[in-house]
From Swiss-Prot:
Zn(2+) 1 binds at residues 69, 71, 84, 87. Its cofactor is Mg(2+); Zn(2+). Its EC number is 2.7.7.6. The lineage of its organism: Bacteria, Pseudomonadati, Pseudomonadota, Alphaproteobacteria, Rickettsiales. This is DNA-directed RNA polymerase subunit beta'. Zn(2+) 2 binds at residues 808, 882, 889, 892. GO terms for biological process: DNA-templated transcription. The RNAP catalytic core consists of 2 alpha, 1 beta, 1 beta' and 1 omega subunit. When a sigma factor is associated with the core the holoenzyme is formed, which can initiate transcription. GO terms for molecular function: DNA binding; DNA-directed RNA polymerase activity; magnesium ion binding; zinc ion binding. One of its GO terms (cellular component) is DNA-directed RNA polymerase complex.
């Protein structure tokens, strides 16, 4: 027996390994066809039978009824295969009407619109004509010269009717040949000699220098090569024979009342047939040319409409003025074939209902309504009833089930025992949106859901619905139990933290239970036994909050029980009782007021040390305990729980005074409107925070009251602090002040809402707040769609990323260190490396002991060793450096976050990465509207304080002492480090240019000491020498203007764009410093003291005044701040993964060198960098309005910013390489999510970046057939080079390019996957010309062709089947030999 048969018979979808797409030749179309359709009729209106030779003809497409010919002469199975001599119909199954095709012989050739109009037009590229010219020929406007003969006309020249007539008169009728219509295009395509054309183009490419021409030639050459390789003939792009798709795919159905509904395709086909028949008649009757041509043009338009309606000219519309759905529309978009029917199918054995909470369920259970279960498990019930002899036949069983006989329920109980069902809540944003549960039969009509899985499903019980699906086969049930059971999905695949964490009421209950109150009855009593305590509690000697001492047995490291005395409360001991005994899980972890965070940590600990089963039991018991005490505590809140702090009015008055001062400064012209706005907004932000802090303090310490029933702790405070419900933000609005509101465009309104919800809002405040609330609502509506789209794009780009091997054997890796921002460690090294593998052997820096072997997984134990060794950076393996040719290897990926072990082969990590990044995006958009538009913007940072007692070290210290004896920072990249006693870096702060430095290098500072301060709203321009000011190129009204503020009437001088004036073109406004002799001062770097002023700079000095060192001569105002929320964030993530150029992007230095300003060009400034190694200097042209962050003579390092802004990703890749680029993208994406408190593992982002870096651009073709500028897949490039080296040729050279995810998805190796993503027609056109082969490696293409996906179980089945085939072949060879 062959091994392959062991896997059962291969289904149709498994009998092929790859799919190829080509252009169909006329002969192929005829070979598919079962007959020609010559009549436009569909069915006979009296008999309702298909018309002969019409669009539904039974002779061509097959019988309408199974095994019955049209006239009824032959019926039943016995006659199968007979062709009726009367009506000509073959007696067979009617299903063939879905498979058999027909054809239409066109009376004139027609250009296929996809090859003509789908940009770039393939026909026009091949013939080297413009699209307009082509259309003129095809639609019978102009003639084209095919052979100039004896005339002086050019080949391919276009002639109008008159010009043709003139030429004929001039040269004679037969002197040249010119023709019109699709026939001539077909002839021209036929005449192309590709081998010769390729040679000519190649030579031309070598000789040309024009970039535009090169691009055009490369395009044409690529197309020629595609045709040569795919063996497609170019004349097939012009159609002679039109295929007619099977009738069942374009059905005609009868509605009630005798009317018919038909597919649009039938109407489009009818038009084609009508026009074709008319054209045939006209040609036969030798009608005048002009009429025939008009008919040909109409036929061309009819075929265009059939293939792609609306692509050219006006779309063909039906009686209701709605455009017809053409063949292209059937494939395109969400409702098209790919996405509607192939990627998303509706399934049988499923149902949906509303969900309700099921607190008494176990974690692996769900409650399924009896009615639903009866319907869903019908086939199982039928077979059981028959098996037990309760019903004699299936029909009898069916009747019993419909009557709902008592024995049916007993059988149902048995059928569903241990038969898992899948529950799914839409939208399924990550894989935890579908989980398996064992059903329990319940009365009622709602599905009961376990409270702990709500977080994973993102479900609540306000009317949410869920769908139930039944896994039918034993394999499906097995997979559901092993992979999808809720108890097997405790950790989140996005960050490896537990996702089964108590929430809301449970947290509140546990928090209440673990509170310890002072002066409670029975304080200080000692107990050694829980039963004794229970007795005391029952008799009211103690309460659950009384502080007591208790002797508790604890497991030590040797595994022995040791008694310890702990200070605790009865409530905490109840939680302690649930803890599994393990030496690593100490009582101290729960001997405190438990907040949501603490509970999460405890669950994580239990999972890491005691395994999954213990965790599930622990979580379930915690939940029951939490619910019990949330109920018995009776916590709720009323009006009095919202406390308005007494200090509120004081804070508000102070702030109003502060703002009056700003107004005054603004009126005096000391600050600009933008600065005033920023200062006002900041002042109110601070005020709101102060009021809120005072309120929180008051809530946290309720008034002392000796009444017995007095509530000892504020309910609102309890809810917020425990993490059960509500946030600091919301409570601030209830009892503090609502604060600043945002406008719909993200701008902050200057006047805050001083009232809170307890006091009530004034009419004006109400209006203002409606503005903000509306913003929240709109955000939710709009952003959810764009977030879903982002997820879809991510899934598409990463879907074929699968773990395919254990180790790729690479030595490469990336270096990681902790993320420090504003002097604080935001993400520790430990967080970044946990679950990754070491790229090199790692040794202890002091003892030199080996901590980690290369390729070893960094787990919690190893992490402690690394931390104690004090390592601050580590080389780890990454998917970015993985060298597997298909997919990724386990070692480079590291730990599978959902299981905590090394990732196994076949895991679809690409999809998991996409879901992990996309899912929080959707959640965050929905979060905004809960705050109701209150602005969440921290005050701008304007100083740094020491976060530790430490020693100061200043890097690139360049300071001047100004007239007020203050140290002013003049360096652009000054950094201040805080070092501990051993000289290790504890914090790092960037000190901006123009800041006042309050400490010096080597100083010792204490915690909270101020180190430096600066104005956060302006960028100053500061002098480093004293001297006399001289204005240069400042012409009033051309390069500088007195701007008088409307509100204050104070004028200030502002630099303006000078390009609108002819004489202003060369102006470069600048300030020079003169010494006493009137000569320009020379600075320390040897250059003259010249300060160029960008557009928008506000002057702080007058011409001719004397200034001293460190004075500000001009200020550049910064843009006003808008709120930071995920709205700013999601588009930022999209911008990064789409690799778009940011709006005001930065310019980065490509080399180390000195800066010089060159001669300006029109509206651009010229920045020149002279490299240290004295190679060619590099020029940058930047718009004049942009703020240049370097000065003339500054020394810049490779990668430094020359202009403020976000750098362009492609520049980072080019200048700094892959690792720096990856670090930058990871850092930026993480910053967006971190702002919202979402944790995503770095490796997910790295997977996406890997997919963005799939292609290389050829810089030198060497001895290969690749073209310079062509973009090819990295692995293909390596394969081509290997071949070249084998054949003794020079390998090609290329550089890595970064593609956005949409582009990367569309250029994936699989055309099926790309076509189902976007731009379906373009992808299919390209693929058909190149004769592309889809190897069916990714997930999408396999789903589309109806196979198991090559991931998980499918991956191994595939692997084993391939091995079986190989062994079978070997066995058969051996047998033959034998």
């Amino acid at each position: 027996m062959s091994l392959v048969n062991f896997y059962g018979q291969l289904s149709n979808t498994q009998q092929f390994d790859q799919i190829r797409i080509n252009i169909a030749s006329p002969d192929q179309v005829r070979s598919w066809s079962f007959g020609e359709v010559t009549k436009p009729e569909t069915i006979n209106y009296r008999t309702f039978k298909p018309e002969k030779d019409g669009l539904f003809c039974a002779r061509i497409f097959g019988p309408v009824k199974d095994y019955e010919c049209l006239c009824g002469k032959y019926k039943r199975m016995k006659n199968r295969g007979i062709i009726c001599e009367k009506c000509g119909v073959e007696v067979t199954v009617s299903r063939v009407r879905r498979e058999r095709m027909g054809h239409i012989e066109l009376a004139a050739p027609i250009a296929h619109i996809w090859f003509l109009k789908s940009l770039p037009s393939r026909i026009s590229t091949l013939l080297d004509m413009t699209m307009r010219d082509l259309e003129k020929i095809l639609y019978f406007e102009n003639y084209v010269v095919l052979d100039p003969g004896l005339s002086i006309l050019q080949k391919g020249e276009l002639l109008t009717e008159e010009e043709l007539q003139k030429a004929k008169d001039k040269y004679g009728e037969d002197a040249f040949t010119a023709s019109i219509g699709a026939e001539v295009i077909q002839q021209m395509l036929k005449d192309l000699d590709f081998a010769k054309l390729k040679q000519e183009l190649y030579e031309e490419l070598q000789n040309t220098t024009s970039e535009v021409k090169k691009k055009k030639l490369v395009k044409r050459l690529k197309l020629v090569e595609d045709f040569l390789e795919s063996e497609n003939k170019p004349e097939w792009m012009i159609i002679d024979v039109l295929p007619v798709i099977p009738p069942e795919i374009r059905p005609l159905v009868m509605l009630d009342g005798g009317r018919f509904a038909t597919s649009d395709l039938n109407e489009l086909y009818r038009r084609v047939i009508n026009r074709n028949n008319r054209l045939k008649k006209l040609i036969e009757s030798k009608a005048p040319d002009i009429i025939v041509r008009n008919e040909k043009r109409m036929l061309q338009e009819a075929v265009d409409a059939l293939f792609d309606n609306g692509r050219r000219g006006r779309a063909a519309k039906n009686a209701n003025k709605r455009p017809f759905k053409s063949l292209s529309d059937m494939l395109k978009g969400k409702q098209g074939r790919f996405r509607q029917n192939l990627l998303g199918k509706r399934v049988d054995y499923s149902g949906r209902s509303v969900i309700v909470v099921g607190p008494e369920l176990k974690l692996h259970q769900c409650g399924l309504p009896k009615k639903m279960a009866l319907e869903l498990f019908k086939p199982f019930i039928y077979s059981k009833l028959e098996l037990y002899g309760i019903a004699t036949t299936i029909k009898a069983a069916k009747r019993m089930v419909e009557a709902e006989k008592p024995e049916v329920w007993d059988v149902l109980e048995e059928v569903i025992r241990e038969h898992p069902v899948l529950l799914n809540r839409a939208p399924t944003l990550h894989r935890l949106g579908i989980q398996a549960f064992e059903p329990l039969l319940i009365e009622g009509k709602a599905i009961q859901l376990h409270p702990l899985v709500c977080a994973a499903f993102n479900a609540d019980f306000d009317g949410d619905q869920m769908a139930v699906h039944i896994p039918l086969s034993i394999e499906a049930q097995l997979e559901a139990r092993v992979f999808m059971m809720s108890t097997n999905n405790i950790l989140s695949p996005a960050n490896g933290r537990p996702i089964i964490v108590p929430d809301k009421d449970i947290v509140l209950g546990l928090y209440y239970l673990t509170i310890a109150f002072d002066n409670e009855v029975g304080e200080g009593l000692m107990f050694s036994d829980l039963a004794e305590m229970e007795h005391a509690l029952y008799n009211k000697f103690i309460t659950i909050h009384t502080k007591i001492k208790y002797r508790r047995n604890q497991l030590n490291a040797e595994g022995k029980m040791v008694p310890v005395i702990v200070d605790t409360t009865y409530g905490r001991l109840m939680v302690g009782e649930l803890l599994p005994s393990n030496p690593n899980i100490e009582f101290k972890f729960i001997n405190k007021q438990l907040t949501k965070k603490d509970i999460s940590l405890v669950i994580d600990l239990v999972y890491r040390h005691c395994g999954q089963k213990a965790t599930v039991i622990f979580a379930d018991q915690l939940m029951k305990l939490g619910f019990k005490y949330a109920c018995s505590s009776g916590i709720s809140f009323g009006m009095d729980d919202m406390v308005v702090p007494e200090s509120k009015s004081t804070h508000i008055n102070e702030t109003q005074l502060e703002i009056k001062e700003f107004e005054q400064q603004y009126s005096n012209g000391l600050i600009t409107y933008g600065e005033k706005y920023n200062k006002v907004v900041d002042a109110w932000s601070r005020c709101t925070d102060r009021v809120a802090n005072d309120m929180m303090k008051e809530i946290a310490t309720p008034p002392i009251n000796d009444e017995p029933n007095h509530q000892k702790i504020n309910a609102i405070y309890m809810m917020a602090v425990s993490g059960a419900r509500g946030s600091f933000q919301q409570i601030k609005q209830l009892g503090g002040m609502r604060g600043l509101m945002t406008k719909s465009n993200g701008q902050i309104i200057q006047t805050p809402i001083i009232s809170n919800f307890k006091e009530g809002l004034t009419e004006f405040e109400c209006f203002n707040s409606a503005n903000g609330m509306r913003k929240g609502q709109i955000d939710t509506a709009l952003k959810t769609a764009s977030s879903g789209y982002l997820t879809r794009k991510l899934v598409d780009v990463a879907q074929d990323c699968i773990i395919t091997e254990k180790d790729c054997g690479t030595d490469k890796g990336i270096e990681v260190k902790s993320v420090i921002e504003g002097g604080e460690v935001i993400v520790s090294l430990a967080e970044k490396i946990l679950g990754r593998t070491a790229a090199i052997d790692i040794f202890h820096p002091v003892t030199n002991d080996l901590i980690l072997n290369k390729g070893e997984l960094i787990n919690e134990v190893k992490l402690e060793q690394i931390e104690s060794a004090g390592l601050d950076r580590i080389m780890i393996k990454s998917v970015l450096t993985c060298e597997s040719t298909t997919g990724i290897c386990s070692i480079c990926y590291g730990r599978d976050l959902a299981t905590g072990t090394l990732v196994s082969e076949g895991e679809a990590i690409g999809v998991i990465a996409a879901q992990s990044i996309g899912e929080p995006g959707t959640q965050l958009t929905m979060r905004t509207f809960h705050i109701g538009g209150a602005a969440t913007k921290g005050a701008e940072i304007s100083s740094v304080e020491a976060s530790y007692d430490a020693k100061v070290k200043i890097i690139s210290r360049n300071v001047v002492i100004n007239s007020e004896e203050r140290k002013i920072v003049m360096s652009r990249n000054c950094e201040l480090l805080l070092l501990d006693n051993n000289g290790n870096e504890k914090a790092r702060h960037k000190i901006p240019y123009g800041a006042r430095l309050l400490v010096d290098d080597g100083d010792m500072v204490i915690k909270t000491q101020k180190l430096a301060e600066w104005d956060p709203y302006t960028i100053p321009i500061i002098t480093e020498k004293s001297g006399k000011v001289l204005f240069k190129d400042m012409v009033e009204g051309i390069s500088i203007r007195d701007v008088t503020d409307e509100a204050t009437g104070i004028p200030s001088k502002v630099i303006i764009e000078s390009k609108q004036y002819s004489r202003g073109a060369e102006l470069r406004p600048r300030i020079q410093l003169l010494d006493a002799k009137g000569e320009v001062i020379t600075l320390s770097n040897g250059l003259e003291a010249r300060y160029y002023l960008p557009v928008g700079a506000v002057l702080s000095v007058e011409d001719g005044v004397q200034i001293s060192v460190g004075d500000i001569i001009a200020r550049i105002p910064k843009e006003s701040t808008t709120t930071k929320d995920i709205t700013g964030g999601l588009p930022r993530v999209a911008e990064l993964v789409e690799a778009r150029r940011p709006k005001d992007h930065a310019v980065i230095a490509e080399v180390d060198g000195r800066v010089e300003f060159g001669k300006d060009y029109k509206s651009k400034r010229r920045i020149i960098i002279h490299p240290i190694d004295e190679t060619m200097s590099i020029e940058y042209m930047v718009p004049k309005g942009k703020h240049v962050v370097v000065n003339e003579g500054d020394f810049v390092k490779k990668g430094d910013l020359l202009i403020d802004g976000n750098p362009v990703l492609q520049d980072i890749l080019k200048v700094m390489g892959v690792e720096v680029l990856a670090n930058y993208i990871v850092k930026e994406v993480q910053a967006v999510y971190r702002l919202q408190g979402v944790k995503i593992d770095d490796k997910h982002i790295e997977v996406i970046i890997r997919q963005m870096l799939q292609k290389v651009e050829i810089t030198d073709s060497g001895g290969t057939t690749l073209l310079v500028g062509e973009k090819v897949d990295r692995h293909e490039f390596d394969e081509i080079n290997e071949k070249a080296i084998k054949n003794g040729l020079k390998p090609a050279e290329a550089q890595l390019i970064l593609q956005g995810i949409t582009k990367a998805s569309l250029q994936t190796r699989s055309f099926i996957s790309a076509a189902s993503f976007q731009e379906t027609t373009r992808v299919l056109t390209e693929a058909a010309i190149a004769g592309k082969v889809d190897k069916l490696r990714g997930l999408k293409e396999n789903v589309i062709v109806g196979r198991l996906v090559p991931a998980g179980t499918g991956y191994f089945m595939d692997k084993m089947r391939k091995a079986a085939v190989k062994l079978d072949e070997e066995n058969s060879i051996n047998a033959d030999k034998g």
